[in-house]
Amino acid sequence: ESIASFQGVLDGKYD
């Protein structure tokens, strides 16, 4: 789920 994590970073949810 590397993509999912990356998307989180882009969305600003993955701090």
UniProtKB/Swiss-Prot annotation:
It is an enzyme of class 7 (translocase). One of its GO terms (biological process) is ATP biosynthetic process. GO terms for cellular component: mitochondrial inner membrane; proton-transporting ATP synthase complex. This is ATP synthase subunit beta, mitochondrial. It comes from Pinus pinaster (Maritime pine). F-type ATPases have 2 components, CF(1) - the catalytic core - and CF(0) - the membrane proton channel. CF(1) has five subunits: alpha(3), beta(3), gamma(1), delta(1), epsilon(1). CF(0) has three main subunits: a, b and c. Belongs to the ATPase alpha/beta chains family. Coiled coil: none annotated. It catalyses: ATP + H2O + 4 H(+)(in) = ADP + phosphate + 5 H(+)(out). Transmembrane segments: none annotated. The lineage of its organism: Eukaryota, Viridiplantae, Streptophyta, Embryophyta, Tracheophyta. Mitochondrial membrane ATP synthase (F(1)F(0) ATP synthase or Complex V) produces ATP from ADP in the presence of a proton gradient across the membrane which is generated by electron transport complexes of the respiratory chain. F-type ATPases consist of two structural domains, F(1) - containing the extramembraneous catalytic core, and F(0) - containing the membrane proton channel, linked together by a central stalk and a peripheral stalk. During catalysis, ATP synthesis in the catalytic domain of F(1) is coupled via a rotary mechanism of the central stalk subunits to proton translocation. It is found in: Mitochondrion; Mitochondrion inner membrane. The keyword Mitochondrion applies.
